[in-house]
Amino acid sequence: LGGRQILMPKYYTNLDELEMKLKTFSFRVTKDKCLDLPPKIYMFRDVHLNLEQKNIYETLRKKARAIIADDTVSFANKLVEILRLHQICNGFLKTDTGQLHVFKNNPKLKELLRILEEVDGKCIIWATYVHNIESIKQTLGDLYGKDSVVSIYGKDSVEDRKLAVASFQHNDRCRFLVGNPSTGGYGLTLTAARNVIYFSNSYNLEVRKQSEDRAHRIGQKNKVSYIDLIVPDSIEMMIISALKRKVKLSAQTLGEEAKKWL
């Protein structure tokens, strides 16, 4: 079987020319100019890995650096190593054999529970991995009652998602919505939320922006707090940096001033 070549951009050129060409057939009005919405408030909460996580993370980080530097290794295999580092930050690791190793006393889950005790109102909790979504939902159901939490992710049917949204929006007993931003981050109205917590992020800026705006749209009367759980000096900081670079590039392409974000 033949391999597939993937070209990776290292820098961008002629952005001014691209901007001028876009202006000839496009007109853009931002949400800020059309709607009078309360502000978004961004916060970070540092999460420190436990000893087992640290040891495995450092071992796999050294391995990942060697693999990424090796030009003979496929791009897909390099991505697997990055994915594993991200999994460790989020409390689990999928091995080569497909087995799931779950770290005891997940520090991120503990920090999430602390945040939920501090904040008022309803909360959306976005997580990238199915394991985290199911674990968070189970934990919150045990602590606050099964009717306090609903989920939206790939395993849920369209009808179940509609029921979850309706319960979150209108049922006072339902305080938490846990979901994957790629599944629940588009088109839904979740303005009952006053807090949006990112248990984890991906490199996809569109998914991030769209998932933020499920709570911050017409009908929202309160300030919305966005809280990111981040492991310092880890792959998660690289993901945040990549998202910020994409925001700046987008603004530059559209001829706008990049707003402070995150």
Q: Model-predicted segments: where are they?
A:
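Short glycine-/polar-rich loops that comprise or flank the Walker A/P-loop
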Residues: 40-42, 145-148, 191-195, 220-226
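SF2 helicase motor core recognition
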Residues: 133-137, 162, 175-200, 204-223
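Inter-lobe coupling linker of SF2 helicases/translocases
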Residues: 1-101, 105-121, 243-248
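Conserved helicase ATPase core of P-loop NTP-dependent helicases/translocases
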Residues: 124-126, 134-137, 141-184
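Conserved nucleotide-binding/hydrolysis micro-motifs of P-loop NTPases
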Residues: 51-54, 130-132, 157, 183-185, ...
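A conserved SF2-helicase RecA2
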Residues: 203-262
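Short beta-strand segments
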Residues: 46-47, 86, 123-130, 149-154, ...
